[in-house]
């Protein structure tokens, strides 16, 4: 892609998200969402193949439907309150439609079907933007309207998302699909605590973006897109193999690593609010995600896939990719748990 065009598209994506996050007028928010959506479509189609075109079309149709529902909810609320600004008073039916629209943009279950399909058809760099940056705008609006959200609807969607995120990744061999299902599960955890403690949702989002960015940077560095390519990476970039598997376990929420921190805090917060069943079910379902990450780790380190010898000797002849941010991101993605006592300052 031409550097000038790429810079323009990237600036538009950033500007669209910034407009959504800083606006209090619904029409401006809608314009920001549309700018963001139309700008990212060329990023999804960088490879110019039918798979990328299909992924971009699915993304466009889903986001356009969500934007239509968002405007429907805004107009319904306009007839109820008589103003365009985000207010604490919200028509109950409009609130439900708004929640559905925003969860569709986030890829929350039961509107999650587009996420794995779109992620699988696009390059790793575009997939990174899709699963991290594109979550900021919808989550910021959910954060703003959190006092008016239908709690039962949001908690139900969160619980289903954690379950689907675990079940969906069990039989996957494509790393982009695994990351997509992991994203669905993490979104479930974030939205579960949104109505009780929105600040904790933002903290969870920060940890999720850090871990996912680290994971994708490692995959881009090693040019791995399947479990097979990950398994034969040991003689290509051995250190990166070890780090990739550690980040995977952190994403799964294994206790000594950073990924356990947000889950621990969310379970604690839900329990404080006398909601015992919800965190119990979510913790059980989180084991599904941890299982497929551990299975992937086992398959990569302790077994060898049936391949020919020349596949095992897969050397890295392409120029080395320099990633200056990778080292601090790896540290943050694995060693932040000791900072947990400082989180008491949030209370």
Swiss-Prot record:
State the family named in the UniProt similarity comment for this chain: Belongs to the complex I subunit 2 family.
Has the keyword NAD been applied to this entry?
yes
Entry GO MF terms: NADH dehydrogenase (ubiquinone) activity
* Protein name in the entry: NADH-ubiquinone oxidoreductase chain 2
Gene Ontology CC annotation, any one:
mitochondrial inner membrane
Name of one Pfam family that matches: NADH_dehy_S2_C
Q: Which key words tag this protein in UniProt?
A: Electron transport, Membrane, Mitochondrion, Mitochondrion inner membrane, NAD, Respiratory chain, Translocase, Transmembrane, Transmembrane helix, Transport, Ubiquinone
Q: What is this enzyme's EC?
A: 7.1.1.2
Q: What does this protein do?
A: Core subunit of the mitochondrial membrane respiratory chain NADH dehydrogenase (Complex I) which catalyzes electron transfer from NADH through the respiratory chain, using ubiquinone as an electron acceptor. Essential for the catalytic activity and assembly of complex I.
- PANTHER family, per the entry: NADH-UBIQUINONE OXIDOREDUCTASE CHAIN 2
Q: How does it assemble?
A: Core subunit of respiratory chain NADH dehydrogenase (Complex I) which is composed of 45 different subunits. Interacts with TMEM242.
